[in-house]
Amino acid sequence: MIGSGKTAIGEQLAKKLQWPFSDLDREMDRELRRSFRDLVHEKGWLAFRELEYKICKRFSRMDRTVIALGGGTVRYEWNTDILRGTGIMILLESNLSSLADRVRKADRPRVNPGVSLEEDLERIWSSAADLYRGCADIIYHVDQGKSVPEEVEDIYNLLQAKKLFTAEHAESAEKNKIE
């Protein structure tokens, strides 16, 4: 979901795992050579979703990479179809007021621009919560008063508990513990 901390947490998780990190929004900006926000404003959400799909196809071929998807990526079946089974999907859940606070600080295009930010987020979540949760292998609640490094440790421990890493990998990640 938009504003949940995907990039901040993803970057630090990748560092801990010693894996590369990719962010869908940054990849879009790189490919467009400008902000994806401009694409949405100039050509609309359909053009955005087409580029998103193209990048998701590229992501689906990556191995051992932490990827921060866009907040709405999994709401579209064509994206989940190509991403399903390619890795572990982690949903970062947050309460709507925290999301609104974070989104308000960023210049993000709105899905429902005719309503308040809170109503926009509520509509997105209520229409897609089952999709988000259905795609997730792990659901982590970010509104627990923890720092990003603490959240990364929690997520790493959840990944370990699901036996998703080898002993060698766990040893490597322990050397990169985030303080």
Predicted regions: what they are:
Residues 32, 52, 60, 102-103, ...:
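Short, flexible helix/strand-to-coil boundary loops that buttress conserved ligand/catalytic motifs
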Residues 12, 16, 126-166, 170:
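NTP-dependent small-molecule kinase module
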Residues 1:
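P-loop (Walker A) phosphate-binding loop of NTP-binding proteins
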Residues 23-82, 109:
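ATP-dependent small-molecule kinase phosphotransfer cores
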Residues 85-130:
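A glycine- and Lys/Arg-enriched "phosphate-lid" helix/loop adjacent to the NTP-binding pocket
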Residues 65, 88, 137-138:
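Well-ordered beta-strand positions
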Residues 71-74, 95-97, 145:
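Short glycine-rich anion-binding loops that position phosphate/pyrophosphate groups of nucleotides
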Residues 7:
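Walker A/P-loop
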